[in-house]
């Protein structure tokens, strides 16, 4: 149908077939060009322009019936995707001064829609006498030579503006963005562009910020630059790092209506990073604002070739700082709308978020006329609007890394001569970062190193900023960029570092050698043992027991001579409740008895090599005698417990639970009947008097001992 309509237009008389297309929506123009092959049937080649008579010379922009027919033909060719043929007709019309910028609307719209389908146009030769065009062409010529020296790993690019990271700020969710990109999106409903978590929940206030809140002020949480990453980027990529700063400075000047000054910043930035597509796309916008259309189109072509498959969305954005995000996604609309830019350039500050949302709604493709073409509607079906990211809605597509450059171009490059593994060493353990975590103050440590420091003091080990909120939340997310950087460029060092960590975890998970010992009180098998953990060494011990997966440690009585008793009980952690100041309450229960073979220490807490002990089983007449003794002592213990006062009995029940039932076979459990240990825990005995019962390997001796204790207590009560 489209082909038939085009052929009919080409066959109409000049008076009827004038260019009467409806005006396209503002901003629906392009920063990219598509010269790829198309499947449509080829239309007839544009007819050559007749030679003009000298007396027929007209003023620029004057339309004749002949020029209207050719303009209609050029627009039709552009709509069909035959861009080269259309440009040839436009060029001839321009040479005859029968073409004005407003008549290129159809071409620009088609360029914006057709770019992702194929290759970009070859660079156009600079016009004679055009100094600016010559400068652009010279930059393109030198770009290939400088690209190898400035090619940047895709991981070093901001996932919000898709440019080289400038003043990188790592959020507590683990993702890193440019500081200015985050400052532009710090409203209460803003979210991380990758994981969708609210920024207000990520930006943890430091001690100074909390102090100002107590004074009645409400300052925004400070954004601190990632010290390690910022220093590394400046060392490895001084050119792109400086170019990124110049880009942000140019954006600021552009918003302040200092367009010429912004152009100078971008010219300098392009020299430092000639393969950064954002620089060309943004400079194309500046050229178009200055009505230097040839330079604008030329820069747009270069941006297209640097990132041919990265152009997706088609949304009009209100200012240059946001246009670079659109250019990173391939938004050509914001790059070629001088009227829009001039209108927004009159403002001296960034617009409020609600105003931007209203503007986006008014200028979105859905609000525009349906006559702007089927390409717009088709594109809206296959892309997500960028406003989701800036208005607080997580964009699923943004979670994926942006596509790397196509072709034979290397996906990453790093100046290994200047790269040193010591640049990625933890300041606490002096080893390569393993599971790096960045604090709100901008310092990076290994996760385990940071946790150990917070066990002692809730402050940053380097700058002493308060980290109590981090300690309270206990949600540490690994820094994504730094993990990927180490895995990509230091694989051998990371392998060795991981090996050390795994060996340490394997050693810690051994429940026979170097078992962690909590020196505190008596513990018994099957009996609950709640613990209040506040000492730094035991915080570390409990955390390691959980991390290794064993969730077990030994409990022993203290000994003034040996350090701790020779016998103890293994406790298993059932639950841990953490407090904001780092303390915790551990719900544990006794599992097995052990004897200490060798004592030692590790990182401030006691450890021991142990052997597990069990009751010796009996058979025959001894077994029958044991059964009778077991039934008798159980009845005696039950009578004593029920004779206690109600208040005391309730306290025992709340702490230890109800008395266990009598076992049908007292030798079924290697540690003996559960009710025996429950009774020993509630009997009013000193810990030293209870310890021999834990060491006994004869159930008969243990039952006789309990019977004697009950008899002694009953006599004293009477």
From Swiss-Prot:
Domain Lon N-terminal: 505-714
Any coiled-coil regions, as ranges: none
Zinc fingers, RING-type class: 158-196, 426-464
Top-rank lineage group of the source organism: Eukaryota
Positions of TPR repeats: 67-100, 243-276, 278-310
Keywords for this protein: Metal-binding, Repeat, TPR repeat, Zinc, Zinc-finger
InterPro entries in the record: Lon_prtase_N, Lon_prtase_N_sf, PUA-like_sf, TPR-like_helical_dom_sf, TPR_rpt, Znf_C3HC4_RING-type, Znf_RING, Znf_RING/FYVE/PHD
Name of the protein in its database record: LON peptidase N-terminal domain and RING finger protein 3
Region named Disordered: 1-69, 322-413
Span of the signal peptide: none
Pfam families reported for this sequence: LON_substr_bdg, zf-C3HC4, zf-C3HC4_2
Record gene name: LONRF3
Gene Ontology cellular component list: cytoplasm
Molecular function terms from GO: ubiquitin protein ligase activity; zinc ion binding
Ranges of compositional bias, category Polar residues: 57-66
Stretches with biased composition (Basic and acidic residues): 339-352
């Amino acid at each position: 149908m489209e082909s038939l309509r085009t052929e009919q237009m080409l066959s109409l008389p000049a008076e009827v077939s004038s260019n009467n297309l409806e005006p396209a929506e503002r901003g629906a123009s392009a920063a990219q060009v598509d010269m790829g092959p198309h499947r449509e049937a080829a239309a007839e080649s544009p007819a050559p322009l007749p030679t003009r008579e000298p007396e027929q010379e007209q003023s620029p922009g004057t339309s004749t019936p002949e020029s209207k027919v050719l303009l209609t033909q050029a627009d039709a060719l552009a709509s069909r995707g035959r861009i080269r043929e259309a440009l040839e007709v436009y060029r001839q019309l321009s040479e005859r001064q029968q073409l004005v910028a407003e008549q290129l609307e159809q071409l620009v719209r088609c360029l914006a829609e057709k770019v992702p389908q194929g290759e970009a146009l070859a660079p156009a030769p600079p016009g004679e006498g055009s100094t600016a065009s010559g400068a652009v062409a010279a930059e393109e010529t030198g770009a290939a030579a400088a690209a190898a020296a400035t090619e940047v790993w895709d991981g070093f690019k901001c996932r919000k503006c898709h440019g080289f990271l400038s003043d990188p700020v790592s959020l507590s969710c683990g993702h890193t963005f440019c500081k200015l990109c985050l400052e532009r999106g710090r409203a209460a409903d803003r979210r991380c562009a990758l994981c969708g978590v609210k920024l207000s929940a990520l930006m943890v206030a430091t001690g100074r910020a909390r102090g100002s809140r107590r004074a009645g002020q409400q300052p925004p949480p400070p954004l601190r630059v990632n010290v390690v990453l910022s220093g590394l980027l400046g060392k490895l990529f001084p050119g792109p790092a400086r170019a990124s700063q110049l880009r942000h400075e140019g954006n600021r000047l552009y918003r302040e209506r200092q367009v010429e000054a912004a152009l100078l910043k971008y010219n300098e930035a392009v020299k430092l990073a000639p393969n950064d597509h954002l620089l060309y796309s943004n400079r194309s916008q500046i050229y178009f604002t200055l009505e230097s259309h040839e330079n604008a189109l030329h820069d747009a072509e270069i941006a297209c070739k640097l990132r041919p498959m990265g152009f997706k969305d088609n949304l009009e954005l209100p200012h240059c700082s946001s246009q670079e995000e659109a250019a990173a996604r391939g938004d050509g609309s914001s790059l070629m709308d001088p009227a829009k830019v001039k209108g927004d350039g009159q403002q001296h500050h960034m617009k409020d978020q609600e105003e931007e949302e209203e503007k986006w709604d008014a200028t979105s493709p859905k609000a525009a006329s349906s006559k702007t073409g089927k390409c717009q509607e088709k594109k809206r079906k296959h892309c997500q609007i960028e406003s989701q990211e800036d208005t607080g809605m997580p964009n699923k597509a943004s979670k994926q890394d942006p596509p790397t450059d196509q072709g034979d171009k290397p996906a990453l490059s790093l100046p290994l001569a200047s790269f040193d593994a010591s640049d990625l060493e933890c300041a606490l353990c002096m080893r390569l970062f393993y599971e790096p975590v960045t604090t709100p103050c901008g310092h990076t440590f290994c996760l385990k190193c940071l946790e150990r420091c917070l066990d002692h003091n809730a402050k940053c080990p380097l700058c002493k900023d308060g980290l109590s909120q981090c300690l309270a939340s206990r949600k540490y997310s690994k820094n994504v960029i730094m993990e990927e950087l180490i895995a990509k460029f230091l694989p051998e060092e990371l392998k060795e570092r991981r090996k050390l960590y795994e060996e340490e975890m394997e050693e810690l998970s051994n429940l026979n050698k170097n078992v962690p010992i909590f020196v505190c009180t008596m513990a018994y098998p099957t009996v609950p043992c709640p613990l209040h953990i506040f000492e730094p060494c035991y915080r570390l011990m409990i955390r390691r027991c959980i991390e290794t997966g064993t969730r077990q440690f030994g409990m022993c009585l203290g000994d003034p001579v040996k350090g701790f008793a020779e016998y103890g009980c293994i406790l298993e952690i059932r639950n841990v409740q953490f407090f904001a100041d780092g303390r915790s309450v551990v719900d544990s229960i006794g599992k097995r008895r052990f004897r200490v073979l060798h004592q030692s220490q590790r990182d401030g807490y006691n450890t021991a090599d142990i052997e597990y002990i069990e009751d010796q089983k009996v058979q025959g007449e001894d077994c029958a005698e044991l059964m009778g003794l077991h039934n008798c002592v159980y009845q005696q213990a039950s009578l004593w417990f029920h004779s206690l006062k109600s208040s005391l009995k309730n306290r025992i029940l709340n702490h230890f639970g109800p008395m266990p039932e009598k076992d049908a076979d007292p030798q079924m459990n290697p540690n003996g009947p559960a009710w025996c240990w429950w009774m020993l825990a509630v009997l009013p005995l000193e810990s030293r008097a209870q310890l021999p019962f834990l060491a006994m390997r004869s159930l008969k001796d243990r039952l006789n001992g309990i019977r004697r204790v009950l008899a002694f207590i009953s006599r004293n009560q009477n």
